[in-house]
Amino acid sequence: MFPMLTEFMNYGQQTVRAARYIGQGFMITLSHANRLPVTIQYPYEKLITSERFRGRIHFEFDKCIACEVCVRVCPIDLPVVDWKLETDIRKKRLLNYSIDFGICIFCGNCVEYCPTNCLSMTEEYELSTYDRHELNYNQIALGRLPMSIIDDYTIRTILNLPEIKT
């Protein structure tokens, strides 16, 4: 008779322990119910990127001296720099500069090590296309400045959202 009593006590303890675990999980769920949602309605609302966000690279053609430091520091040798040596002035003249963003890993080494600061990172991150060849940007496409999210009147940013009272 005593073994049956101890089994019943073990069953009761297990039931209490299971109820405690379920209660702990329920309390965690309830603690998250008061928080605001993290998701946003993406095409219509956008997050404002941080100051050091590494988005699309902006290139200033006039500042580039065709030193190819960006190619040497790139872990995948991505930037394509075409130049011609001007013999009369003994300097390189930049002919073409391009970056394929389908391959770029956005490490920022090219921007950091550029001696003339002709490269900079923008806050543009929407680079998706249906054709991967459209991701190969030449110096004209790299020279375009993106529209700032804050200046875009068609998009509600998180700063402009109405506050939800809790």
From Swiss-Prot:
**Residue positions binding [4Fe-4S] cluster 2:** C74, C104, C107, C110
Q: Which cofactor does it need?
A: [4Fe-4S] cluster
Keyword Zinc set for record: no
Q: Which residues form the signal peptide?
A: none
Name of the protein in its database record:
NAD(P)H-quinone oxidoreductase subunit I, chloroplastic
| Any Pfam family hit | Fer4
What's the main place this protein lives? plastid
Topology within the bilayer? Peripheral membrane protein
Record keyword Translocase present: yes
Query: What does it do?
Result: NDH shuttles electrons from NAD(P)H:plastoquinone, via FMN and iron-sulfur (Fe-S) centers, to quinones in the photosynthetic chain and possibly in a chloroplast respiratory chain. The immediate electron acceptor for the enzyme in this species is believed to be plastoquinone. Couples the redox reaction to proton translocation, and thus conserves the redox energy in a proton gradient.
Which cell locations does it reside in?
Plastid, Chloroplast thylakoid membrane
One example of the protein's molecular function in GO is:
4 iron, 4 sulfur cluster binding
